[in-house]
């Protein structure tokens, strides 16, 4: 007998599993299809984010930073450690334990909320039917009133550097190194490349980042990207801009990479090479020819502002649709879609989705950059506050970076918050909340912030917008 559901979700990443749980909470009979399995062959929920993305990379970032601090900075606090060593296998094992715990947690949440997990590859057929292909090749077809496509993305492959997951690896392979490579190359100076490059640089690798663009972190505010490049270079990342990789040759346990820059053709040899040039949507074999769902030339599914496809009752969320490939975007899209299935008037504010790079210092922003606003002809006032003037940052021996608040010169409404420094990912969320409610810089300046805290830097930057900062000299006079 054919199984029937109110909602069938294809993909159990941060978009899919959140949508499935929310649907079940709202009383909808829900199933979630996922093909990903762990090393033991068991169903692994959570998608790229939990298994080989957001979570494991943060585990390695935190472990590597603690190692670097113990080796270089504990003496500032009066702590003598002797020789500091890193057990890479133990570090990677800790990461794996965290992943197992969290993916198991999603399974527990499915059970608690009554979501049916189905292991296999999901494919949308005509009439909102979904074909599930099991690992043994058998298939079954289930029916749904509503289908949510949340199949995620995978690393982009480039012909000049074919991944073998041995010497040349993608972001997944870079999480599994069992030893620190002496010479590490990274193709791509984006979020993934900088984070993974930072991990292994802290542990002693000589890291070279090859970026085809001439501009570093183009999406970030110019002041932030300049500070980030300076700081990361000081930490040991050799960032080569305008370096377009044209070829690679693996020789045993090393790889010779050929790239071109302003000086012509160059060659450089690495022990490991990480290809981190972005991700592409996973829509291959997701849709039957008669499904009715439309995709573009790059594999993205066409949707409207509410993630509805061209087929009534079929939706797509997360990395398979246009926009930033962010876990939190996918999750909120999933919730919005389910709310709308239930008849609620839910929507998302795509202008206020925070972006974060988990290097050290962290880099985070929400809203528009100063250069973008100037290009639009918007007059702005800007306030900045350096963490070097923060008592809490000094106490933590973590004073690099600053907070920057941008406000409309006419209305004082906050249009952008940009942070590079300690806990930037947490601080920028305060800016997102303020901007969601149309807060002015003056409003932020009138709020009482706990002392001593890092968040006071946001307070002071907001005050500085109108020349009222207390703990730093004001560029703008009141």
Curated annotation (Swiss-Prot):
GO terms for biological process: 2-oxoglutarate metabolic process. GO terms for cellular component: cytoplasm. It comes from Pseudomonas putida (Arthrobacter siderocapsulatus). This is Dihydrolipoyl dehydrogenase. Keywords: Cytoplasm, Disulfide bond, FAD, Flavoprotein, NAD, Oxidoreductase, Redox-active center. Its EC number is 1.8.1.4. It is an enzyme of class 1 (oxidoreductase). It is found in: Cytoplasm. Disulfide bonds join 49-54. Its cofactor is FAD. Belongs to the class-I pyridine nucleotide-disulfide oxidoreductase family. The lineage of its organism: Bacteria, Pseudomonadati, Pseudomonadota, Gammaproteobacteria, Pseudomonadales. It catalyses: N(6)-[(R)-dihydrolipoyl]-L-lysyl-[protein] + NAD(+) = N(6)-[(R)-lipoyl]-L-lysyl-[protein] + NADH + H(+). InterPro entries: Class-I_Pyr_Nuc-Dis_Oxidored, FAD/NAD-bd_sf, FAD/NAD-binding_dom, FAD/NAD-linked_Rdtase_dimer_sf, Lipoamide_DH, Pyr_nuc-diS_OxRdtase, Pyr_nucl-diS_OxRdtase_dimer, Pyr_OxRdtase_I_AS. Pfam families: Pyr_redox_2 (PF07992), Pyr_redox_dim (PF02852). FAD binds at residues 34-49, 58, 122, 319, 327. The keyword tRNA processing does not apply. The active site is at residue 451. NAD(+) binds at residues 188-192, 211, 245, 276-279. It comes from the Bacteria.
């Amino acid at each position: 007998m054919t199984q029937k559901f109110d909602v069938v979700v294809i993909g159990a990443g941060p978009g899919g599993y959140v949508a499935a749980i929310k649907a079940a909470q709202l009383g909808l009979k829900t199933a979630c299809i996922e093909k990903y399995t762990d090393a033991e062959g068991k169903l692994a929920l959570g998608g790229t984010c939990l298994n080989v993305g957001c979570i494991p990379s943060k585990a390695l970032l935190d472990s590597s930073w603690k190692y670097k601090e113990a080796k270089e900075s504990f003496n500032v606090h009066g702590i003598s450690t002797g020789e500091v060593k890193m057990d890479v296998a133990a570090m990677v094992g800790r990461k794996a334990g965290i992943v197992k715990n969290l993916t198991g947690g999603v399974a527990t949440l499915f059970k608690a909320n009554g979501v049916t997990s189905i292991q296999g590859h999901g494919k949308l057929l005509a009439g909102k039917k979904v074909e599930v292909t099991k690992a043994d090749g058998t298939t079954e077809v289930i029916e749904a009133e509503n289908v949510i496509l949340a199949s995620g993305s995978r690393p982009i492959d480039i012909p000049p550097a074919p991944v073998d997951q041995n010497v040349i690896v993608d972001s997944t392979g870079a999480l599994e190194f069992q030893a620190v490579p002496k010479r590490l190359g990274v193709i791509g100076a984006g979020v993934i490349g900088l984070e993974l490059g930072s991990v292994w640089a802290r542990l002693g690798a000589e890291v070279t980042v090859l970026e085809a663009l001439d501009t570093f972190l183009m999406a970030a505010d110019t002041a932030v990207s300049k500070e980030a490049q300076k700081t990361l270079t000081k930490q040991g990342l050799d960032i080569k801009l305008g370096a377009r990789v044209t070829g690679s040759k693996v020789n045993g346990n090393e790889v010779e990479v050929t790239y071109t820059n302003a000086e012509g053709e160059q060659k450089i040899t690495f022990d490991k090479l990480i290809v981190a040039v972005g991700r592409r949507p996973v829509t291959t074999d997701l849709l039957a020819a008669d499904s009715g769902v439309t995709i573009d030339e790059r594999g993205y599914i066409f949707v409207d502002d509410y993630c509805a496809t061209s087929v009534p009752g079929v939706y797509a969320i997360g990395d398979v649709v246009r926009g930033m490939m962010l876990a939190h975007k996918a999750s909120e899209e999933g919730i919005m879609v389910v709310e709308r299935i239930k008849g609620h008037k839910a929507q998302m504010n795509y202008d206020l989705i925070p972006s974060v790079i988990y290097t050290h210092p962290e880099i985070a922003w929400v809203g528009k950059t100063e250069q973008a606003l100037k290009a639009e002809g918007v007059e702005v006032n800007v306030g900045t506050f350096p963490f070097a003037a923060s008592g809490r940052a000094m106490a933590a021996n973590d004073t690099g970076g600053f907070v920057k608040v941008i406000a409309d010169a006419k209305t004082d409404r906050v249009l952008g918050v940009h942070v590079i420094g300690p806990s930037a990912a947490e601080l920028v969320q305060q800016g997102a909340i303020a901007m969601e409610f149309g807060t002015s810089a003056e409003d932020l300046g009138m709020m009482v912030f706990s002392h001593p805290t890092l968040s006071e830097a946001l307070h002071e930057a907001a005050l500085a917008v109108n020349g009222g900062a207390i703990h730093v000299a004001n560029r703008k006079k009141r």
